[in-house]
Amino acid sequence: MEQVRKLTGAALEAEGMDLVLAEFKREGGGYILRLYVDKEGGITLGDCTMVSRYVGDLLDAYADEMPRYRLEVSSPGLDRPLTREDHFRRFEGRTALIVTKEPREGRKKFRGVLSGALNGVITLVADEVPMEFALHEIESARLQYKHGESTC
């Protein structure tokens, strides 16, 4: 999967796009490769179609190394995943949910406002209390859309 991320991420970056998240999961009777892609100004249906064709052709060269899969390409959506430090920085001031790998203070889920991202440390303000999380401690993180909040 890491090789898929590297190949597709580099190819999309050359096209001015960002591979936000790549998931390879078993669902139903087969596998799904889901790519969440974004770019400045947002992604269009045409962009998703182009990425699907481009990545499909790129990964065909590795068909012998991967099980059969269905490729899905979409925008990250309003509750977009945050997977890299630059994602957290881009959305400072927005509400997010961080799930940690290990419990902290008896829990693993923390909701608050992103207030910083520097040197691999993410700062989230929950109930007016700043909390710091090292990127390697985070299992997953997503924006939490609130009605009336700007999506940019």
Curated annotation (Swiss-Prot):
GO biological process annotation, one example: ribosomal small subunit assembly
Entry keyword set: Cytoplasm, Ribosome biogenesis
Phylogenetic placement of the source organism: Bacteria, Pseudomonadati, Thermodesulfobacteriota, Desulfobacteria, Desulfobacterales
Highest taxon of the lineage: Bacteria
Gene designation per UniProt: rimP
Recorded family membership: Belongs to the RimP family.
Record protein name field: Ribosome maturation factor RimP
Gene3D superfamilies listed in its UniProt record: Ribosome maturation factor RimP, C-terminal domain, RimP-like superfamily, N-terminal
Entry's Gene Ontology cellular component terms: cytosol
InterPro entries: Ribosome_maturation_RimP, RimP_C, RimP_C_sf, RimP_N, RimP_N_sf
Function field: Required for maturation of 30S ribosomal subunits.
Compartmental location: Cytoplasm
The species this protein was found in: Desulfatibacillum aliphaticivorans
